[in-house]
Regions:
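Non-cytosolic coordination micro-motifs
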Residues: 23-69, 108-209
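Mid-chain, structured segments of secreted extracytoplasmic proteins
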Residues: 65-115
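Bacterial N-terminal signal peptides
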Residues: 7-17
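Positively charged n-region of N-terminal signal peptides that target proteins for export
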Residues: 1-4
């Protein structure tokens, strides 16, 4: 009887510890100083360069405070593209070793409502061919559990690369935001052996009530 009671108490304790560890696994920041849901005014200018409007790359911004200069989309979000400052990031604009394109989305109230991380399609071939692996690193960062993933099938003419075909979409909800990770690795019918689709796209979106 005592063993049964002890086992039940231990199981409850272990479950609580695992739940707490899972909750702690969610990072407080999504990317450096950026957390989706924060006021854009709280984001420092130091460490970030080449701020431009995603829809109008020729329109350069002097600071985050100029986000209103970028045109709004149909959801009233202003998209600002940016890079890491080479003085604070010697490897350039990379996430987990992958060259990336970064975009922050700001609503009319000045709230960061979204963050997009996309592997750079212009990266060198030997780096770009590993681009699909970034998705796994992102999923690991936010905890391996709780992802809802769907594998999509090839369309007409699409072929595997090195024996691997990948078109995957994964979603997960964490406190205050929704995560979407899309990974692709395949060759289109019109691409030669040195050309192929290999990319990861990460979308972090503020949850709405």
């Amino acid at each position: 009887m005592k063993r049964s009671v002890f086992a039940a108490i231990f199981a409850t304790f272990l479950s609580a510890v695992m739940h707490a560890a899972s909750a702690q696994a969610v990072p407080s920041y999504d990317l450096r100083d950026i957390t989706v849901g924060m006021p854009i005014g709280d984001l420092p200018n130091e460490g970030y360069v080449n701020l431009t409007c995603a829809k109008d790359p020729d329109r350069k911004l002097s600071a985050w405070s100029a986000w209103r200069d970028c045109p709004a989309d149909e959801r009233s979000r202003h998209a600002v593209r940016f890079d890491f400052d080479p003085e604070t990031s010697q490897d350039g604009t990379k996430v987990a070793g992958h060259p990336v394109l970064l975009t922050v989305l700001v609503d009319d109230k000045g709230t960061v409502t979204g963050l997009t991380i996309e592997t750079d399609p212009k990266a060198r071939l030997y780096i770009r061919k590993k681009a699909f692996l970034l998705g796994n690193q992102v999923k690991s960062r936010y905890g391996a559990e709780g992802w809802d993933c769907k594998e999509l099938q090839p369309t007409a003419g699409e072929q595997p690369v090195g024996g691997v075909f990948l078109r995957e979409v994964c979603n997960k909800t964490v406190p205050g935001r929704t995560l979407t990770v899309e990974r692709e690795l395949f060759r289109k019918p019109d691409q030669d052996i040195k050309s192929f689709v290999d990319q990861t796209l990460v979308r972090i979106t503020k949850q709405t009530n």
